[in-house]
Structure formats: C-alpha cells, structure tokens
Amino acid sequence: MKSARLLSLFLALSTVSVFAGIKSERQLAAIIDRTPAARLVAEGAQLKTAEAAAAAIPGAEAFWGIGESMEPLYATNTAIVVTPIAYDDVKKGMTVVYIKSNGRRVAHSIVGETRGGYLVQGVNNDEPDAEVVNEKNLIGVITAAYATTDSQFRTETTARLVAKGKIKTSNRT
C-alpha cells in the first residue's frame, strides 16, 4: 500500500464562513464539470479508500489534503486520487496537483493559460497562484476524492449554474 503523502491545499487567508475565492460563473462551471465531487466515506476511512482506488489505476497516487484554499469544494482532510495526465490533455476546470518551486505539492484548479503554462487558483483564493503549472511541475489530475462531509457549496453552485444554463445537468454533485 502506498504511504500517505501530505498535500498542502495552499492555506488561504480567508475564512470558510465567507466564501472569498473564484466568483466567475464560467470558471466555477468548468471546475464543477471537470473536477470530481467528493464521495462520502466514514470518518477515518478517507485515505485508506483513496489508496485502494489509486492502487487500481496505473501511476495514480493518494494524497491527504490539508488547508483551506479548495474549501468549500474540498474540505481539509479530504483524501484525493491523483492520476498522471499528459500536459497537452489538461483543460480549464480540471483540478491538478503540481509541485511548487519550494517543493510543496498543491492542488488547485486550472483557470487560464499563458505562454509559460496554466494558471491555477484555489476556489477559496481571490487570485491565481504566482507560479504556473507546466510540463515539469505537473504531477497529475484529481480523478477521485473522499470526504466525511458533503459540499453544500458544490450542490448550491451546481443548481444555480444549471438554472442559468451555464452547465447542462445537475448530475454533477
């Protein structure tokens, strides 16, 4: 079984009770469309479940998420499965894991593209990260997540975006 790895979800300065972060409905729709919802599991089973799922996917790894930058989409203590992806297959809205220049692993969503790489941002952060994701620092894309609580934010945001015609189905929660 793969050893647990700590993944910093890049601590945000904002609090969870007041959602700061990404306001663009277009970006939120892409994130909801291309980032998997967390599956609910029993307390204490998050990482074990993610490790079992990762073991069934070639090259996949399980990580333990900490921090507030992806809240309320993914709460702290959400375990994630990260699957390798070709750099050219990355799309806006995917939530990827990359290695920052200081060596920390970060899970954030793709919100744009520049000549130097992809812009990424935590859904709870007001600005994109200072560093971009490129072929050298990309680890993979989140393909599954396991948590003990449901994301009310995801449910409410999905319903709002479906009502406005921004996404096609409410089957994304």
Model regions and ranges:
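Bacterial N-terminal signal peptides that target proteins for export
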Residues: M1-L7
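Extended hydrophobic leader/signal-anchor segments used for secretion and membrane insertion
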Residues: L9, V18-T173
